[in-house]
Amino acid sequence: MGKNDFLTPKAIANRIKAKGLQKLRWYCQMCQKQCRDENGFKCHCMSESHQRQMQVFGQNPTRVVDGYSEEFEQTFLDLMRRSHRFSRIAATVVYNEYINDRHHVHMNSTEWATLTEFIKHLGKTGKCKVEETPKGWFITYIDRDSETLFKERLKNKRVKSDLAEEEKQEREIQRQIERAAEKLNGGGGEGETSGNDEVVDDGDDERKKDEDLRLKSGVKVGFALGGGVKQVATGKERGESSKLLFGDEENDKVERGEKRKRSGDSGRSEKERRSALDELMKEEEKKKERMNRKDYWLFEGIIVKVMSKALAEKGYYKQKGVVKKVIDNYVGEIKMLDSKHVLRVDQKELETVLPQIGGMVKIVNGAYRGSNARLLGVDTEKFCAKVQIEKGVYDGRVIKSIEYEDICKLA
């Protein structure tokens, strides 16, 4: 039997074995000691040091397990970030690289019994993109480092500046509409005053004509001097004066007809003004619709319904969740309301949710995209709703008909 000296073959073999990986079931995580065989592990479990560590564990087992689980997850993700940051790789390959470090946190000390459970946890929490294939589980690291966050901030700044520019343009259009309305109203007022002046002038001309007719026809004109002597008109004079009076009545009728025509013209001009304003408003709505109508509609903070039949086995089909984050405009990180699990779902497999009447909604598409509004009513036959915008540039504006797909309940 070989001796156990320092340079003997047996001692060298033991040191080589100690450097390499040993069996996982003979490792004590609390004492961080690896045993070489079952007998050694049994002796270690009966030792005084191990018993003390087990007493510490018994005081708060949940905290100890959570601590090891957090350390295991963090170390695993650090390895993914360093070695496979932008690649899709098999989970077993990453795990084999991870356990090459003999001082790693062992999985039997965490809350996950198998690698599959741990990979599913990474997918639910949104830390990795998880995919199950016939060849096993594949994972892709989701980069959330400072560089990515910096790019996201720049992107958000660009979006905000674009929105501010759109608001400025809309305000300018609104001012132009108001100026056009004021000019139209001012022009109408001048026309009315000129019309009144013409009426007065016509009346003066008619009075002058009447006086000339009286002088030519020889009608006597009486002047009251001093005592105010009354002049008695003859029958002939009465007849002629009555003719003149009837002539004045006819002139009054003509004047009334002209006034009616002018009032009709002013009414028509008012209608024309209103129609012009309506046309301007419609043009503005169409322009906003063209600018803000997108093929993506996800926003953070809205409640959506999962309609993916592939997730029916997991119990997520037709379940509601809150959009916590939007990735590349089309994919949302959804935190389920019931299970609190986090999923990544494409917008094609999601559906908008309507609140009760009076609830708050987000306009997710169309002319007023991004505005918050209050639901006033629902038309089930036309599949549209009536909302009133709250806050922002369009505060108080009522949209009488907006499609269900363009609004979504706010969380």
From Swiss-Prot:
It is found in: Nucleus speckle. Residues 182-211, 232-286 are annotated as: Disordered. A motif (Nuclear localization signal (NLS)) lies at residues 259-262. Residues 358-409 are annotated as: C-terminal subdomain B. Interacts with SPL7. The keyword DNA-binding does not apply. It comes from Arabidopsis thaliana (Mouse-ear cress). Residues 147-183, 265-294 form a coiled coil. Plants silencing KIN17 show aberrant growth and reduced fertility. GO terms for molecular function: zinc ion binding. It comes from the Eukaryota. PROSITE patterns: ZINC_FINGER_C2H2_1. A zinc finger (C2H2-type) spans 28-50. Belongs to the KIN17 family. One of its GO terms (cellular component) is nuclear speck. Promotes the copper deficiency response by direct interaction with SPL7. Acts with SPL7 in a common pathway to promote copper-responsive genes and alleviate oxidative stress during copper-limiting periods. May promote SPL7 function when copper is limiting. Participates in the control of general plant growth and development, and in the response to counteract the negative effects of UV radiation. Expressed in root vasculature, lateral roots, cotyledons, rosette leaves, cauline leaves, stems, sepals, style of pistils, mature pollen grains and siliques. Pfam families: C2H2-zf_KIN17 (PF25095), KN17_SH3 (PF18131), SH3_KIN17_C (PF25092), WH_KIN17 (PF10357). Residues 253-286 have a biased composition (Basic and acidic residues). One of its GO terms (biological process) is cellular response to copper ion starvation. This is KIN17-like protein. Residues 301-352 are annotated as: C-terminal subdomain A. Residues 51-160 are annotated as: Winged helix-turn-helix (wHTH). Signal peptide: none annotated.
